[in-house]
């Protein structure tokens, strides 16, 4: 299998740049490595946040969008997102209707 990786140390950052370029309806918080809906938070909707280790794309960030996740945290390669990332995602999609979070 051929892999298109410029530098292993930059793979997560470059993947997020690719998501941002390919999906204008999504936003990326580059400081926290979070992909989230551009229209978040949605009034009257429970926020749904997921996250997990990078390296299995399009898993988690690939499921952000209408009828799916509101935000996804990209951990480092094969590493779960850190609590600060999940907290930052919580603040991005918070609307007072509660949230569901799942991280792997």
Region locations from a protein language model:
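N-terminal amphipathic/basic leader segments beginning at the initiator methionine
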Residues: 1-47
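Short glycine-rich or small-residue beta-strand-to-loop segments that form or flank ligand, phosphate
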Residues: 2, 46-53, 69-76, 94, ...
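Conserved active-site and cofactor/substrate-binding residues in soluble primary-metabolism enzymes
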Residues: 7-14, 43, 55, 59, ...
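Glycine-rich, flexible N-terminal cofactor/catalytic loop recognition
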Residues: 34-66, 73
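Glycine-rich oxoanion-binding loops at beta->alpha junctions
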Residues: 56, 63-96
């Amino acid at each position: 299998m051929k892999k298109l990786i410029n530098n292993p140390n930059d793979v997560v950052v470059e993947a997020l740049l690719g998501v941002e370029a390919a999906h204008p309806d999504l936003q990326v918080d580059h400081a926290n490595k979070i992909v989230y809906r551009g229209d978040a938070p949605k009034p009257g909707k429970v926020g749904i946040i997921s996250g997990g280790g990078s390296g299995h794309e399009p898993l988690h960030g690939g499921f952000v969008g209408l009828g799916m996740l509101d935000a996804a945290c990209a951990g480092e390669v094969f590493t779960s997102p850190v609590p600060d990332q999940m907290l930052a995602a919580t603040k991005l999609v918070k609307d007072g209707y509660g949230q569901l979070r799942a991280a792997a």
